[in-house]
Amino acid sequence: VASRLRVTELCQLLIESGLNFTWSCTSRVDTIRPGTLELMKKAGCWEISFGLETGSNELLKKMDKAAEVEKSEQAVNWTAAAGIRTKGLFMLGYPGETRETVELTKAFVRRIPMTIMNLTKFTPYPGSPIYRDLYGTNIRDDHWERMNGMNFVWAPDGMTVDELDRHYQDILMSFYQRPKMGLYYASLSIRYPHHLLRLARFGLGFLAAKIRSYVQGR
C-alpha cells in the first residue's frame, strides 16, 4: 500500500464486482489507516506484509526508513484490529546493530500482534550502496557462495558472526516459542489442513537450504 487513494479505488471495484477471492499484499507502515484496512478486509485481503526491520529507531534511521518503531507498532495493531493477519519482515546484523538493538527487536516482536515473522540476515550485495560503504569498489569473492541471505558474511563492530547467529535463533524463538503462537498455528492447521502440509513443505525446504548453505560455506 503506497497510495491509499488507489487502494480504495481497487477495493471498491473488487467489492462491486462480486468476485469471491482472497489476496495479500505488502504495505508501508506510514500509509495505512483503519478505514483503509476495513475496506481491504471487506474486499478480501487476508494478510499484509510490513517491512518492520528492527525494534530500534536508531537503526531505522540508518536504513533511511521513513517510519519509527511507534508508527510500525500502530500499523500492526490497526491491521490486527481489522481482522487481517500481519507478516513482519525483519533484518538482523545491519551496520550499527548492537546487543542493545537486538534486545529491542526481541521485545518488539513479542509485543506486537504479528501472525508470522520473517527474519533475514543482513547481506551486503555487490553493487549496492551499503556494499560500497563497507568494502569500497572492490568485489570480494571469499564468501560469494554464502551471500544468499541465509548466512552472516559480515558483522558490525563489537559483534561476531557466531554471536549474530545466536541472536538470530533467539529472536525467532522469542516469537514462535510462545504458547499463544503454538495455539494459533494448531487451530489454523485444524481449520485448514492444507496449511499444515504447506508448513511442512516450507520447513523441509528451509532445512535443505540451510544444509546446502553450510556445505557450500565450509
Region spans (language model):
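A structural motif corresponding to the C-terminal lobe/cap of the Radical SAM core domain
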Residues: R4, L10-P193
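Acidic catalytic loop of the alpha/beta-hydrolase fold
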Residues: V1
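Membrane-proximal basic amphipathic "stem/tether" segments
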Residues: S174-R218
